[in-house]
Amino acid sequence: MALAGTGVFAEILDGEVYRYYADGEWRTSASGKSVAIVNPTTRKTQYRVQACTQEEVNKAMDAAKVAQKAWARTPLWKRADVLHKAAAILKEHKAPIAECLVKEIAKPAKDAVSEVVRSGDLVSYTAEEGVRILGEGKLVVSDSFPGNERNKYCLSSKIPLGVVLAIPPFNYPANLAGSKIGPALIAGNALVLKPPTQGAVAALHMVHCFHLAGFPKGLISCVTGKGSEIGDFLTMHPGVNCISFTGGDTGIAISKKAGMVPLQMELGGKDACIVLEDADLDLVSANIVKGGFSYSGQRCTAVKVVLIMESIADAVVQKVNAKLAKLKVGPPEDDSDITPVVTESSANFIEGLVMDAKEKGATFCQEYRREGNLIWPLLLDHVRPDMRIAWEEPFGPVLPVIRINSVEEGIHHCNASNFGLQGCIFTRDINKAILISDAMETGTVQINSAPARGPDHFSFQGLKDSGIGSQGITNSINMMTKVKSTVINLPSPSYTMG
């Protein structure tokens, strides 16, 4: 029995179309239009959401601006209390939200539930961390700088930016919405959420949990619609004071149009896995399979290219192939390891990379197999730098192996990429691992583990085309605030008294 849009969530559904949320109410768009969300498994329309107009975006922004002023004056402990309540409601209603993730983005059922629970934990932790971070200020006295007496005291604290525009990606529409919503709200900001089309209904259910928690009217909005209609309008809106975006190269275009608005962006990666001769090959093979093929490789932090020393390449490829043969391929409802990729266009793009590699002589460790959006796991050996898949991000269950003859060769390939999100190194020599880590031009390097985002309080950032700024709970709270200073001027130096 379907759980989405029923029970406490019934009010977010208008017939067959999910409403959008603005000014504390669930609304039907005046456009009279809707956007279809196609189930990646059935390739049929699963849900519909409102196609909001630019005027409706304007009204949401106006309401956010008004609500934010009052919210910023709300005591910090009260903000935290409402966030804790929202987190509890979110976890209580994990089943219908997880159902949406299964049907919208083909996320395996067990992983869908885990994402919702993780999102609730993230929001609670954010509330706790926010009380600590924002509850502290800084005092600086003037005589610490040469030539000054102690006649000035500078008190600095963090204040909200205003209205945060949050744009999460399809692959983690709940968790990466929570990672933006929580920090924005605890810091005293208002928030306008523009969810991805695939994942929009899960996001709407999530927003309703915040509605049920009792956040002030207008503080949170969730607008849905076509990017061609409201995408640029949102990102260039004069009412936006901060943009937090996770996704692909659309973010580069946003950054060029954003002007003076602070940006937090994670835009993908080509995460390299460098394997040295002394590595634990069982550990390596397990992490290559987990890192490269979890959620069908549709993760920014997935292993995207394996750079392995020639002397151990055959052994590692053999171990990886044995593990790939055991993966369950099928629909997400069956908790399959490999599920359909999110859209037909994504599957076509992946196939294009595979065919290019085939034409240029890559070794296919498995037969290439595709049914609709479902692509079976494929390891490509003897990949060369002239193949597209050596550089482009497939975002699917296809992984290239490049054989190298030196550590320097592996580092060079990693650093030649226009991406720089994460990378990983497998070796028993910690000294060598640190040296390689320092040489890799990535935001994070994992030693003896596959790339990963999290735990959610860890710093998470990319270099080059992989992003701007840093995420993680503490970093996000700091990014969504600005420093306000008050200087107390004394008529005479304070240490003359007493």
Swiss-Prot record:
GO cellular component, as recorded: cytoplasm
Binding site for NAD(+): G247, G248, D249, T250, G251
Known catalytic reactions: D-glyceraldehyde 3-phosphate + NADP(+) + H2O = (2R)-3-phosphoglycerate + NADPH + 2 H(+)
Superkingdom: Eukaryota
UniProt KW keywords: Cytoplasm, NADP, Oxidoreductase
Annotated residues for binding of NADP(+): K194, T197, D232, E393
Molecular function GO labels: glyceraldehyde-3-phosphate dehydrogenase (NADP+) (non-phosphorylating) activity; lactaldehyde dehydrogenase (NAD+) activity
Family per record: Belongs to the aldehyde dehydrogenase family.
This protein's name: NADP-dependent glyceraldehyde-3-phosphate dehydrogenase
Protein source organism: Zea mays (Maize)
Gene that encodes it: GPN1
